Amino acid sequence: MQLQALQDLVHKTRDARRAQTLPKYSQAERDTLITKYHPDHRESAYRAIKFGPNAGEKTVRELAALLEGDSPVPADADLTPTHSTDVLVVGGGGAGCAAVLHAHAHGAKVLLATKLRLGDSNTVMAQGGIQIAITNEDSPVQHFLDTLKGGHMKNDHQLLKTMVEEGPSIAKWLLELGVLFDRDADGNLHVKKGGGSSRPRLLTCSDYTGLEIMRVLKDEVLNQKIQLLEFSAAVELLSDGQGNCTGAILQDLDNKRYLVVAAKTVILATGGIGRLHIQGFPTSNHYGATGDALPMSYRLGAKLLQIDTFQYHPTGAVYPEQLIGALVTEGIRSEGGHLVNARGERFVNELDTRDVVSSSIIRECEEGRGVRTTTGRLGVWLDTPLLDVESGSGTLDKHFPAMVRQYKRYGLDITKDPVLIYPTLHYQNGGVQIDVNGESGVRNLFVAGEASGGLHGRNRLMGNSLLDLMVYGKRSGSTAAERVKSMKHGKLTLEHLARFRSEAKKHAGSLEAHSPMLFPDYVRKEG
C-alpha cells in the first residue's frame, strides 16, 4: 500500500480509535515484551569488559572499546599548569552550568570548560518538561514511587530520594532565575502527565523546556563573569599518585594544543553517549554526545553502574530523511496523540513507560505491521492531528510550536497529517557511580547529569533528566566548593594512566582506539 493510502487510513480510523481505552500491560506481559524486543536484550550487541573496575561485566561493544581504549595524551606530556582553579567543571550543558553557578555562589574560584560552545548540549533539546512534585494532589513520595517502578526497582534509593525531595526548591530557583514555565488561565503553574507517572507533574515551556532552562543558566554564567573555555575538550584526568583527582588535560580544538588545568576538584558533566550510535540506531543527541566522562573516569579507577542499559525514546523521526532520529516529544502522547500501525490500529497504551512503548513499536515493525518509507525505513504513525481534533484548532501550534516549525521546513504539516516515528537512541541509563553529593569513588572527582549512574535504574521516566541535572549539578558544585576551602592543590601526575596502559597490554585488542572519541566519525569510506 502506498504511503499516502496508509496515511489516509489514520484519518479514517481516528473516530473509532478515540472511543478506545487501551489498558496497560500486566507486569508479566511487560517483562516478556521487553525481553523479546528491547535492544538492551540483544545478546550479540554486548561483550564483557576485559579489565578495570568493571572487568567481566557486559556492556555494548561500542562502549567497551572506548573503556579499553588508550588516552591520546603521551606518557611524557608536559604537565606544567596553564590554568589553576579551585573547581574545574567540564561540560557546558544544564548540569555543568548548574554546578559552576552553585560552586561560584559558595565562593570558589571556578573554571568552566566545554567541548563546543556554552549551551551546546542535550539539555537544549529536551522538549517534554521537568518532573517536580508541586501540586496538592502530588508529593515527592509519589514521585519516588513512580520513578522506582519505571526504573524496574533498580534505582539507587538515596540518589532518588534526594532528587525528588529537592525538586520543589529547584523549581523555585529556576523561577527566580527567570525560567518562563507555562501557566494556566489563573496564573498557576501548569502541569502535565508524563508516561509512567501516576500524577501530572511535568512543568513545561511549550516544547522548548530544555532550551528555556538553558537560556537562563547560560545568561547567569555570563552575568557572573565565570571563566569560560569554549572549544576545549577534556581528554585526560590528572591524579596525585595516591588515587585523588587533581585536575585535567584539555585539548584546544582550534590549535590542537593541550591545556593543563590544576584543580582541587573536578566535576564532569559531559552528557550522554548517543553519538556512538549503539547497535546502529539513530540518535536524538547533539553532535558532541560521545560519553567522554566514562573512559576518563574509568582510567582513573571510577566504578561504572548499569552500563548495559540504554534508553531508546519511542518517538524518533523516521521521515523525512533529514530528521532521522530527531526527537518527537513525548508531550504529543501526553496530550492524547495515538500510536497507529499500518492497519490503522492502536497497539499500546501511549503513556506506558518508554521501554514498553519502544518495545511495542519494534514488535509492530518486526511482525509486519510497520509502515515502510520510500527509502526503506520502518516506523509507525503518531497521530498528531488528533490533538487539534480533541482540544480545538491551534492546539499543536500553541503547545508544540518547535515541532510544527521543524516539520514545516520540509513541507510537512503535522496539524493536518500524522508523522512517522521509530525508537531513537536517547539516553544512557547508567554511568559513573556517585554518592548523594555527586562524588565518584575517586576522591575529588564529581560527576553530574547523564554521565552519572544509579539514579534512573534501568529505564528513565520522562522529565527526570532535567531535574537530575539541576539537583546533582547543584549538589556537586556546592560540595566541591565547600571542600576546597580546606585544601591545597595536589601533585599533577599521569601515574594512573601508566598503570592503565600496563594492564591493558595484557589483553589483546585493547588500546586500539583512542578515547574519549570527542566527535563521531561520519566520513564515508571509499572502496
Where are the model-predicted features located?
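Conserved N-terminal glycine-rich FAD pyrophosphate-binding loop of Rossmann-like flavoproteins
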Residues: 116-146, 152, 311-314, 322-326
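Extreme N-terminal leader/targeting segments of oxidoreductases
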Residues: 1-86
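Glycine-rich loop(s) and the adjacent beta-strand/alpha-helix scaffold that form part
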Residues: 265-322, 326, 462-479
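Short hydrophobic core segments
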Residues: 87-90, 260-271, 446
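Conserved redox-cofactor binding core of oxidoreductases
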Residues: 38-59, 63, 176-257, 262, ...
